[in-house]
Amino acid sequence: MKPWILLLVMFISGVVMLLPVLGSFWNKDPFLDMIRETEQCWVQPPYKYCEKRCTKIMTCVRPNHTCCWTYCGNICLDNEEPLKSMLNP
């Protein structure tokens, strides 16, 4: 066997084995860019608000709601409702 063929085979096998280790062979997961970082809720909501959960990408389905974290996990909190319930005894 000619020496340049042996070198070519060794080079190709080395590149094929090295690509998955470097991590450049696969594309990045597109859902990681969509996930938002949640902030702590600005009020301590009552337990009834723990039923409204955020989606997996930390957004809310309902309009005028914000995803935030509290003692019961990530919840969708209405931007106006907790303040109304705090003002009305």
Swiss-Prot record:
Primary subcellular site in the record, as a coarse category: secreted
Signal peptide: 1-23
Top-level taxon of origin: Eukaryota
Claim: Cell wall biogenesis/degradation is one of the keywords in the record: no
Keyword Thylakoid: no
GO molecular function, one term: serine-type endopeptidase inhibitor activity
Keywords, comma-separated and alphabetical: Secreted, Signal
Location within or outside the cell: Secreted
Annotated GO biological process: antibacterial humoral response; innate immune response
A cellular component term, taken from the record's GO annotations: extracellular space
Miscellaneous comment: Although this protein was isolated in a region containing several WAP proteins and was defined as a WAP protein, it does not contain a classical WAP domain.
Protein name as catalogued: Protein WFDC9
